[in-house]
Curated annotation (Swiss-Prot):
The chain crosses the membrane at residues 28-48, 54-74, 530-550, 558-578, 593-613, 656-676, 680-700. Keywords: Cell wall biogenesis/degradation, Glycosyltransferase, Golgi apparatus, Membrane, Transferase, Transmembrane, Transmembrane helix. GO terms for biological process: cell wall organization; cellulose biosynthetic process. The keyword Acyltransferase does not apply. It comes from the Eukaryota. This is Cellulose synthase-like protein G1. The gene is CSLG1.
């Protein structure tokens, strides 16, 4: 049933919501698939009772339990998916009635996150089609870099030309880099002059970054000349004082024609000390929450990664269609836009779109209590950070109350003094910050964890996915960078899974069953490494040994495996296609799940165990957004896998690839020339081999820098050969694979053994 929401003031329909057409078929299929899973569990239990060796059966049972659970978490998001539509053109309000907006942009490393990228993101939101005096942009520089500070000073000067140009000419691409690199940008004298100004600014910033320091000759603003003296020899990214600088003030700054008011632009680098925990990105966001609370305290907050520029100047008004709706705004915590990326290869070879996480699952969540928070592109209700909708948790000082009206100048001395105080590294001691107030601590995936806790407190959220992307970002172009990013996510997800606020316990208790199961999908996703490892090695070794671990083709249970496998993959493919994907992208996405399971998830689990045992400390490694390697970029555009430098991360993956290839050759030979019924094993091995084709090419055929290293291939080969040699050295011990039960031995293996005895 379609629902409409109206703005009670002007009576316009601002947004609609309607269920997806696939809901009923998915619900029917869920019943049949559930029955199939129950039958499979019965088969496993029966095999466990009758088997001579329980280890193999237990491993297969464990793997199928994980697969069944992950299917249940996905299915919970398929039972009530909805799509929404907004009407921003119908939003009507006087300029003075528009709510204020605070924008939080986070960066941490000027070399992995180039300052010009930060500049373009900041300029794109400063130029929103919105009253400029209502916008305040806060840039958190967690690396405390003078290079980033210099770039933002340059951005403030350029904005006085850029913002009037955008609004006067109704420019849609309000990131200067995107606008000037497009073929459709204006060729007028004004535009060409502005392009020259931008290129000059870009040249200065990149020169400073390349040299690693800000030379005095480049500092043209006397107002900020003394600020650079703060970067002394003792200043480091892990130990430095608070720096807060107002680079642009809406109360006093106007464009060069004196017609347009400029938005606020504030640089924030919080105090850091090696003896005080800083809680990574969550700590930086909480610092911005307090600093902005003291200075502007806008009721709406937009969080952005430094590479996620605004692609639509009307995005803010789209969010207001929900955030100002009197019927839902009191319980609405945030409006989440999907992450979308520019520069993705034609078939998204690394599955960087993350369509399942950012689109498919979000549509499912939206039919329950609302989407998860994904770390960027999210408009928050400031009140949501201060306790449940029904109970306001007061902060420690009155200046941080969410409903306070900030009526003092942001450059007032007492305001700046208090802002420096709340950005101190010991300010949060003995407060509710990170536990009951603000972004939550306890996981490296602070975004997902915070969204989960807000939902548990009773807040709802909305997924806004307009046809024109609201934001565009950058994605890894090298498999090493992607795997490194996923390891960090895996550790954070494990932290969430095993905490006292685990979605499977606290989530299901605090939320309804479907929402709780849906929230289990991502935190338990690293457990995919269990079935991927078991099914990547066990049936293959069985096939090489001529032993069956699956039902034969003549066994009725054979068809249960076929139906469950093809049914699950067909539903996954339909999800992808119905949300605008393609078959090739889906294929790459499911292949990347295998790669992540045997690399990121595998090593993420090891790192989590070491961290739990206090044998290592958590690390927040910034994913590089700098794409300076032309050869690497060329390989990505040609959709050639780039395994980068020699890395142990790919050792399990390479080992599995080698085992599957040998099993495929041996199994195919056995079936073609000796007969037999190991069809399920051979089907699984064939599926794995096709998925591993890029790995085989990187091992043998390629000579470029993106190939798999000889060391990794050598170690992987030795692992397989070593395991085989152990078997040969112990002929008197029956292989565990042959003890599954006697009548599981394949026909072709028996015939082969019989022929050998006759020849003797």
């Amino acid at each position: 049933m379609e629902t409409h929401r109206k703005n009670s003031v002007v009576g316009n329909i601002l947004h609609t919501c309607h269920p997806c057409r696939r809901t009923i078929p998915y619900r029917i299929y869920a019943i049949f698939h559930t029955c199939g899973i129950i039958a499979l569990m019965y088969h496993h239990v029966h095999s466990l009772v009758t088997a001579n060796n329980t280890l193999i059966t237990c491993l297969l049972l464990l793997s199928d339990i994980v697969l069944a659970f992950m299917w249940a978490t996905t299915t919970s998001l398929r039972l009530n998916p909805v799509h929404r539509t907004e009407c921003p053109e119908k939003y009507a309000a006087k300029p003075e009635d528009f709510p204020k907006l605070d924008v939080f942009i986070c960066t941490a490393d000027p070399y992995k996150e180039p300052p010009m990228m930060v500049v373009n993101t900041a300029l794109s939101v400063m130029a929103y089609e919105y009253p400029s005096d209502k916008i305040s942009v806060y840039v958190s520089d967690d690396g405390g870099s003078s290079l980033t500070f210099f770039a933002l000073i340059e951005a403030a000067k350029f904005s006085k030309q850029w913002l009037p140009f955008c609004k006067k000419n109704n420019v849609q691409d309000r990131s200067p880099e995107v606008y000037f690199s497009s073929e459709s940008h204006s060729r007028s004298d004004e535009a060409e002059n502005l392009k020259m100004m931008y290129e000059d600014m870009k040249s200065r910033v990149e020169h400073v970054v390349e040299s690693g320091k800000v030379e005095t000759a480049f500092i043209t603003c006397d107002q900020f000349r003394g600020v650079f003296d703060l970067w002394t020899d003792k200043f480091s990214r892990h130990d430095h004082p608070t720096i807060i600088q107002v680079l642009q003030n809406s109360e006093t700054d106007m464009d060069n024609t004196r017609k347009y008011i400029m938005p606020n632009l504030i640089y924030v680098s919080r105090e850091k000390s090696k003896v005080s925990p800083h809680h990574f990105k969550a700590g930086a966001l909480n610092t911005l929450l307090r600093v902005s609370g003291v200075m502007t305290n806008s009721p709406i907050i937009l969080t952005l990664d430094c590479d996620m520029y605004s692609n639509d100047p009307a995005t803010l008004v789209r969010a207001l269609c929900y955030l100002t709706d009197p019927e839902i705004k009191s319980g609405l915590g945030y409006v989440q836009f999907p992450q979308k990326f520019l520069g993705i290869s034609k078939n998204d070879i690394y599955a960087c779109e993350n369509k399942r996480l950012f689109i498919i699952n979000m549509v499912g969540f939206d039919g329950l209590m609302g989407p998860t928070h994904v770390g960027t592109g999210c408009f928050f209700n400031r009140r949501a950070f201060y306790g449940p909708p029904y109970m306001l948790i007061l902060p420690e000082i009155n200046e941080l109350k969410p409903y306070r009206i900030a009526d003092k100048s942001i450059k007032a001395q007492d305001v700046l003094s208090l802002a420096h105080n709340v950005a101190g590294c010991i300010y949060e001691y003995n407060t509710n910050w990170g536990s009951k107030i603000g972004f939550r601590y306890g996981s490296l995936v602070e975004d997902y964890y915070t969204g989960f806790m807000l939902h548990c407190e009773g807040w709802r959220s909305v997924f806004c996915n307009p046809k024109k992307a609201a934001f565009y970002g950058d994605s890894p172009k090298c498999l090493v960078d992607l795997v490194g990013q996923q390891i960090r996510w895996a550790v954070g997800l494990f932290e969430m899974s095993f905490s006292k606020y685990s979605p499977i316990t606290y989530g299901i208790k605090s939320l309804d069953l479907l929402m709780g199961l849906g929230y289990c999908n991502s935190p338990f996703k690293p457990f995919w490494s269990i079935p991927l490892t078991v099914y990547g090695l066990l049936p293959q070794l069985a096939l090489i040994s001529g032993v069956s671990v699956f039902p034969k083709a003549s066994d009725p249970w054979f068809w249960l495996y076929i139906i469950l496998f093809f049914g699950a993959y067909a539903q996954d493919l339909s999800d992808f296609l119905l949300e605008g994907g393609t078959y090739r992208k889906w294929w790459n996405d499911q292949r990347m799940l295998m790669i992540k399971g045997l690399s990121s998830f595998f090593f993420g689990f090891i790192e989590f165990i070491l961290k739990t045992l206090n044998l290592s400390t958590p690390k927040f490694n910034v994913t590089s957004k700098a794409n300076d390697d032309d050869e690497q970029r060329k390989r990505y555009e040609q959709e050639i896998f780039d395994f980068g430098t020699s890395s142990s991360m790919f050792l399990p993956l390479t080992t599995v690839a080698i085992v599957n290839l040998l099993a495929f050759v041996w199994g195919l030979y056995g079936i073609l020339f000796c007969g037999g019924e190991l069809y399920l094993e051979l089907m699984l091995v064939s599926f794995a081999v096709v998925n591993c084709l890029p790995i085989y090419g990187a091992m043998v055929l390629r000579k470029d820098d993106g190939k798999l290293s000889k060391r990794t291939c050598f170690l992987a080969g030795n692992l397989h050969v070593g395991s085989y040699c152990v078997k040969l050295l112990r002929p008197q011990v029956t292989s565990p694979l042959r003890l599954i039960h006697n009548n599981n031995t394949s026909g072709w293996f028996k015939r082969k053994k019989h022929n050998m005895n006759e020849s003797v």
